[in-house]
Amino acid sequence: MDKTQSRLRRARQTRIKIAELQVARLAVHRTNTHIYAQVFSPCGTKVLASASTLEAEVRAQLADKSGKGGNVAAATLIGKRIAEKAKAAGIESVAFDRSGFRYHGRVKALAEAAREAGLKF
């Protein structure tokens, strides 16, 4: 089993457990150059809020710093944005789905920023 298959296996198990809880899910996906966050409905079929480093506003803010979306500063910004959007959609608490990625670096920065912005998980 290679690295990608192991990550996907971990993600699948996490999503099964979160589905049993029937709560909104904050899913994170990261690539080498970008990071994405989405809040899914408790049934898992609708996206209620989303944020990523591909958004024009985010890219403009990141252009001042490093111009890239693949760093901790970008992940922190996305964490704040997803928390604001989720709260605007009426969601106060979520289950954190790290999609099989280690809770370290950019994933950790996004989670901590979302918590600081008022999202509970």
Curated annotation (Swiss-Prot):
GO terms for cellular component: cytosolic large ribosomal subunit. Keywords: Ribonucleoprotein, Ribosomal protein, RNA-binding, rRNA-binding. The keyword Transcription regulation does not apply. One of its GO terms (molecular function) is 5S rRNA binding. It holds the Pfam family Ribosomal_L18p. GO terms for biological process: translation. Part of the 50S ribosomal subunit; part of the 5S rRNA/L5/L18/L25 subcomplex. Contacts the 5S and 23S rRNAs. NCBIfam families: L18_bact. This is Large ribosomal subunit protein uL18.
